[in-house]
Amino acid sequence: YNRTLKKAERWADEYGGRIAATPREAAEGAQIVFACVGNDDDLRSVVLGADGAFAGMAKEAIFFDNTTASAEVARELHAAARERGLHFIDAPVSGGQAGAVNGLLTVMCGGDAEPFARAQPVAMAFGRAVTLIGPSGAGQLAKMVNQIAIVGLVQGLSEGISFGLAAGLDMKLVLAVIGKGAAQSWQ
């Protein structure tokens, strides 16, 4: 299932499988459902309601959400899952497109330990580190820590470049040199 039918068709053509008309249809019979959408509202739209994934999931199934969303929506959907006899793990990722393509994402998880332990080996197919940080919402909060750290790195690089330019340095040369030392960052 994809909210954009053309994307689902392309994926099915390339990798095989069947296209589901709704999240509910896609989730029917699955022990673990993985999802990654744009934001809180998108997440609610694919999870809740008569055609949402929760409606099609069997008791004790796990919804493993890789969306970068709010900790509040993670807690909300965790509670909604519990009411239905399901499990919800908030599991935002870090590593960018290259990490996703190469199975090297870092996955920061929030939720209950038992369903996490069941889902972790499956998530290792796309993650090099899949870690339970704490209760529901903790994965989203850890992702916020990650984003704050990245912003600090980008800000520091900007300040360094500004300083170097003001000092009259050849910044192409400086960046090439510091890129081989402790200032190296894949970002």
PLM regions with names:
Residues 19, 23-87:
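Rossmann-fold NAD(P) dinucleotide-binding segment
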Residues 15, 83-84, 167:
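Helix C-cap/helix->beta junction micro-motif
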Residues 1-15:
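NAD(P)-binding Rossmann-fold cofactor-contacting core
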Residues 8, 26, 116-119, 174:
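Small-residue helix-packing motif on alpha-helices
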Residues 37, 68-147:
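Rossmann-fold dinucleotide-binding core
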Residues 118, 138-187:
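Helical "substrate-binding/catalytic lid" subdomain
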Residues 8, 77, 160:
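Aromatic/hydrophobic pocket-lining residues that form π-stacking "cages" and hydrophobic walls in ligand
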